[in-house]
Amino acid sequence: MHTPARTATAAALAAATAVALAACSTPADDEAPGVTDDTVTIGTHQPLTGPAAAGYSAISAATSAYFAYLNDNGGVHGRDIEYIVKDDGYDPSATQSAVRELVTEDEVLAIVNGLGTPTHSAVLDYLDEQEVPDLFVSSGSLTWNQPGVYPNTFAFNADYVTEGAALAQYAVEQRPDATICVLGQDDDYGEGILEGVETVVDGNAIAEIQTYSTANEDVTAQIGAMMAAGCEVNVLGTINGFTAMAVGTAAALDWAPQWYVSSSGGDYPTLVGYLGEDVAPALLQGMVSVNYLPFSPDDPWVALFRQINDDYNDGAPFTGNTVFGMSVGYLFAEALAAAGEDPTRASLVAAVESGELLGNGIVPLSYGPDDHAAYRSVGITVVDDGVQDYTGTVYSVDAGQVTTVEAEPVPLANDGIPQPPEE
Amino acid sequence: MDRLVFLLATGLARGAVLALFALSLVIVWRAARAVNFAQAAMAVCAVYIAFALTAASGSYWLGLAGGLAAGAALGAAVERGLMRRLPHLTPLPGMICAIGLVMVLQSGLAIAFGPEHRPMRPPFSQSPFVIGGVPVLSPYDLFVLVTAAAVMGALALLFAGTSLGLRLRAAAFAPETSRLLGVRVPRMVTIGWALSVAAAALAAILLVPTELGLNPHAADLLFVNAFAVAVIGGLDSPAGALAAGLGVGVLVSLTTGYVSASAAPLAVLALLTAVLLLRPGGLFAAREARRA
Amino acid sequence: MRTLLRAALITLLAIAATFGLDPFRNYQLATAAGVFAAVAGLTVLIGLTGQLSLGHAVLMAAGGYGYAATATAVDAAAPDAGPAALLAGLAGAAAASGALGLLLGMAAARLRGPYLAGLTLALVIALPSAANVLPLGGEQGLSAPFLPVPEALSALIAVEQWHAWLAILISAAAVTPLVLLRAGRPGLRMRAVLGDETAAALAGVRPGPVKTAAFVASAVPAGLGGAVLAVATQQVTPGGYGLAFSLTLVVAAVIGGLGSIGGAAIGAVLVVALPWLVDTAVEAVPADLGQRLNGNLAVLLFGAVVIAATLARPDGAAGLLARLRRPTPAAPTPATPSTNTER
């Protein structure tokens, strides 16, 4: 019979194939991998394919566009930034493979803006073991802010609990007697928003709590239940597509409650893309959301980012994701500029921890040696007449306490090209 | 009570689309003894054509007709160009080829049109009629139900009452004998594929306006649920596809409404397991398929 | 005995090969070893008994969860217990996947081809929901203990290489019994059931128990493969075992050649390496076509390769090897489509 001999041959062949794939590079163990005389190489993992690509593939494109603009204007310390974007299709095992390749093969200086809670959780321990700076994670999970456990990991988004608490606080102030309900994604995102709402509103006072799963693009049953429960203010911990679906489904039922939406699902231009330009302004009128990045139509940052989007991103649709991606790029460039003439992994982390980075938010960054969260306060936005803008109300959330604070927008300087700190 | 009526009505409308897609799987199974794993990707290709035609002409109906024609053409092309060239002794090469085709079509669509969701307008209002204070079916839901029922009826007539239907079934069940009797078996298989993908395209065209919008993955879940529906109903049985489709639609709606959204796939799995344990060939299994 | 020697030899060769690989390649090798164990189980199931399972990813996940839960518990109860956590974890993986395999196998014994396919497909879709409803950590999954390089070796090898060794050893332990099973009496019984159930029953082989046993025998290596992935990644998430991955396992089994363990090895290496190779090749081409091409082109080319390979060699790589060894063409397979396609 053929079996054992053939098995041996085939296995040997497979092993030989694997050996043939071997490249001769070994990871450099110096302190500044990815840094040459004229380049700095960094990497990220993003969902470029698969169902999650629809919402998020625009972010890394915007970041790349900002870096192209930066490189055309001299880069940082004379070095161009090379941004390697790896696709993980929002699959945690693909993230594992992508990030290991970035660290060991591409020898990146840092991982920047890795997207997603389940995906990035999968590489958190690995990046910690390898002591790779893990900057500006693109998710609102509280996991990223554990300086004692993960000294090199830093969050970028305001966390979901903060957003939920701010939305609930605004709802209570605007409409003290309204019936509040929550619709959330069936994961840490929805749970975080709910937790935030519960810090402001007593859990029993939430009339209806519904969840959805991204696999099933239908929220009719959930919206029906909320309508039956007489909800007046619906706090949504939903991604943009499901925000649109919730609003559209309610409209079909002739139901017009107030929508209070987390920043991850309350981006007006993206929602218009889902709902269609003809009906969106009416359906989204009065929608409340939160944000911490420049988004007012007349903001100089927005004007600059629009220009970069036209020049370096083929004029892709300009949405909240565009601002998000470019803001991440700017913040990294600022950190790199502050990390010194010859940046290392350690000096990059030290630069972020120094607390001296400004970013470009409407509220201050909160990075420090003991705090790896980026934004602890958020501003309320409202859609009026097809324009989403800040109301001026800003909440800071700390240890379950919501307090009103003043906005402190960072002014645009030097055309968005970070300068090395003065000696 | 109000909530029950609302959930039942919603479930029926969703179930009609499921039933139609499951029917398309039954057609290709009857015609070629194959489960087409690329059915969703092929249907979505046809929807993109329908979408483009509607956008260009402004007429939903022109887009619908174009989408159906494109589905039929795609089905015939895939059968002639790919499936026919594979050995039919086992279903596996056809299945693997279909999985490869899914990758090619979905990434091709994503390259050509981007991953964005494109909103598709329904031809009728989605605001439900309110009866006794309870919102029930919308005009669009009724359109979906009527269309699905009409297509089911037409196909039942085709298979039971016409010579073409007879030849289609004969070619699938007894290809050798049919050939001897003068049935052009290869042509029958091609016709079966074309009919099947056209039906799947119709189901997808009906589904997309109720979802987020058209994207390369718009029909993925539809396929998976419809496959479960076809298996529950019995792969040979159009009536089974109809009954199981409506049943699964209602089950998903009730589970989502009364338990939680994440419990719905488990409920479908439980129903599927229960039915198969009691009737291994599905609810409406023909006697021949039940021997085991 | 010869099989055992051969298995030991191949295992040693594979371990020796890890010295020629850099850390990332060793990580890929560990992944491929885990996938190999699962594909080997699947290929024996489909090739010998004709039962088409689309749900082997869930069996892998069951093994991964079993490993993570048990190993974490043992690690917490007795830290520094050395290999105890690993061994207990592997036992947990085998138990979890074996139990699920038994349940599925009992259902599968009553079902024919597409019906079993439908059931296992629904199982894959239900996995994320099950992870939410059961205490399996939801979307984030469970984490498994990190196994550092033993001190005696730490000067010699990196952690990726150590994990590759573990992966190779576990996979060898998972697949070798499968090879023995396939060559021995159980293999004959399975083939008898595949050939003609009625004839097999007349010859005293009861098809039901044989099919169920084959499912369990296929599920345990798959579960150990899941444990291998948990060792290499320290994580089990439902997202890692989705529909696409489950279908990829079937693709690997068929491309390798059904029923062939060597083919399973080729298939596993292909599905791990090919997308990455294509991706690398695509990156080398200056792509000014914008972000849409990014990632998608790799999937497209992978799909095209799968189609081309199926058209060229429906019997897979193992069939191609057999053809190369034996210059005279094999006897033509009967091409009559008949009712037995309804397996």
Q: Where are the regions that the model predicts?
A:
Chain C
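Transmembrane alpha-helices and adjacent helix-loop boundaries
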Residues: 1-343
